[in-house]
Amino acid sequence: MSKVSGSNGGDSKNTLYCSFCGKSQHEVRKLIAGPTVFICDECVELCMDIIREENKSSMVKSRDGVPTPQDIIKVLDEYVIGQRQAKKILSVAVHNHYKRLAHASKNGEVELAKSNIMLVGPTGCGKTYLAQTLARIIDVPFTMADATTLTEAGYVGEDVENIILKLLQAADYNVERAQRGIVYIDEVDKISRKSDNPSITRDVSGEGVQQALLKIMEGTVASVPPQGGRKHPQQEFLQVDTTNILFICGGAFAGLDKIISARGEKTSIGFGATVKAQDDRRVGEVLRELEPEDLVKFGLIPEFIGRLPVLATLEDLDEDALIQILSEPKNALIKQYQRLFEMEDVELTFHEDALREIARKAIVRKTGARGLRSIMEKILLDTMFELPTLEGVREVVISEEVVRGSARPLYIYADRQEEKANASA
């Protein structure tokens, strides 16, 4: 309960006082009542300032505030299946980035350059999820931008400075906190140069966006409207320094594996030419040989690649990895649907061969882990529709035939479970 200060007069016996500073209810704007004590709005603000300062100093001064690469990878393992090499590269890069910030605040002797990260891997292999999990581990503001919506300033579409605005919003407009955040730019392969030949038509959503991103990725002071919206001359702007913001770019780069394979082949003709067998390796295996020059051939400008010195490639997920994704992580899909069914007091059970069939379907769709949820929704749609109106159902069993569509899920009722219990006794 809060008491709003009234007039200065009144009975002194009924006057309430702040238990911390001793001011009366007439001297402050608000007085908040607890069971036996009172606190005024001024003391609340003072406490908040002290807490902010403590958090800031511990974040900057304590080396323990930066998780070790082993700590980071341990948490990533709980949420993301496989991709060991990519996780190792990311954990070291993120650890070094925040260690660099702590070092910079202690002395200005050696200036350590920022190491932005490029994630390359097939669709649905966990690029976005890795970046989101990293931000959660470090506990810094995080925002995600879609490169396909970005255009050069002055054209229809989003300016690159809108990315910084989103980060500022994620930090509740705390500029200092936003300046230590992480930005993930997805679908960065879609802003590749449209062609090698210069054209009379300006490429405002391809090379133009790459050029616009250069400055904010390297470090500049961006002017951001305080509460969003369009810029106008009379408006005051918030100044956000992007020097210490970590940028992670990700993309599927469809066809990049062919560029890498072509680089490795020797071009020879005639009777003495070496006949090379078809490259049957999976996309992820080919991507391991990625070099910056391959990204230039794909259509990214050298200056843009230069701002992303850390290259991490992710592998396409095989059947076993998809089964693990379904059942093992903390927030695995199977666990999510089992929790949904628990709300109806029903146990949801999947046979091992059912999980394998779901994984096979996802591989056929070529959507990676992203396609698993839509497959699960299709399998369980009728069951989730009927279940709230059915009485006595205690368990739903999903078999391989159910996943294939040749059978309906098995419903086990309460009386059948009692029969099972009696039989086992």
Curated annotation (Swiss-Prot):
Q: InterPro entries attached here?
A: AAA+_ATPase, ATP-dep_Clp_protease_ClpX, ATPase_AAA_core, Clp_ATPase_C, Clp_protease_ATP-bd_su_ClpX, ClpX_bact, P-loop_NTPase, Znf_CppX_C4
Q: Sorted alphabetically, which Pfam families does this protein's record hold? A: AAA_2 (PF07724), ClpB_D2-small (PF10431), zf-C4_ClpX (PF06689)
Domain ClpX-type ZB, which positions?
Answer: 6-59
* Spans traversing the lipid bilayer: none
Give any Gene Ontology cellular component.
Answer: HslUV protease complex
- Which of this chain's residues are annotated to bind ATP? 122-129
> Which molecular function terms from Gene Ontology are attached?
ATP binding; ATP hydrolysis activity; ATP-dependent protein folding chaperone; protein dimerization activity; unfolded protein binding; zinc ion binding
Keywords of the record, alphabetical order, are:
ATP-binding, Chaperone, Metal-binding, Nucleotide-binding, Zinc
Q: Which SMART domains match?
A: AAA (SM00382), ClpB_D2-small (SM01086), zf-C4_ClpX (SM00994)
Record PROSITE patterns: CLPX_ZB
Q: Which residues bind Zn(2+)?
A: 18, 21, 40, 43
A GO BP entry? cell division
Which CDD domains does this entry report, sorted A to Z? RecA-like_ClpX
Subunit record text: Component of the ClpX-ClpP complex. Forms a hexameric ring that, in the presence of ATP, binds to fourteen ClpP subunits assembled into a disk-like structure with a central cavity, resembling the structure of eukaryotic proteasomes.
Stored NCBIfam families: clpX, PRK05342.1
Similarity comment: family membership: Belongs to the ClpX chaperone family.
Function per UniProt: ATP-dependent specificity component of the Clp protease. It directs the protease to specific substrates. Can perform chaperone functions in the absence of ClpP.
- What is the protein's name according to its record? ATP-dependent Clp protease ATP-binding subunit ClpX
